[in-house]
């Protein structure tokens, strides 16, 4: 198939020194691109991999925890206007990613007229360039990613919570169970298998997130100053900025195998959960 041919060609290029200077006269160099990416600290790949793993872990932990407690709030019978809240909640998720990122870059994070800096100035503080250094840029990207991704996770958890039989909670209350006890022993075990596919899918999406990091910090002609790199932006930069196609292809193959390994482990985990 076309995909197999494309992947095979990428694998072949990863074993060559194809770049801007060796476009038509590239040579076979074996696993040199792989060793450069994985074994040489100055290649930048290991740093990008660490950033990607940190990015994925923090985003998913915060996303699931925050979504869980917001979804619990939606389960309150005395909460009025649930449909209105849920409808409003879908806007960040339904809005095109490019539009959301542009709005946040210009309307929220901009040094001169962004909302955050207007608030800081009003409070008597100086202006801050949120995208100029790596740590603030990382946190800014993560905040935007959470804003875009939380609605989906909230809706999935809300649906899972709605499917739990209320009689379990009534029995637990008769036994004197409190809020945390009910959540730990009833809610979480009951919804774990239901939301697992959504968590896995969102983890994949977060792991390979490109748009947010690129458009906030690295868009051509508008570099913010931060040198934040994930493995996806690292591969893109080597291919289309440095024109080092051999290394970029090797990184793409490494990413492919990382995703394959993660898929195998998550599928095994989901199967074991279903059998239990």
Label each PLM-derived region with a short phrase.
Residues 1-276:
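A structural signal for multi-pass alpha-helical bundles of membrane permease subunits
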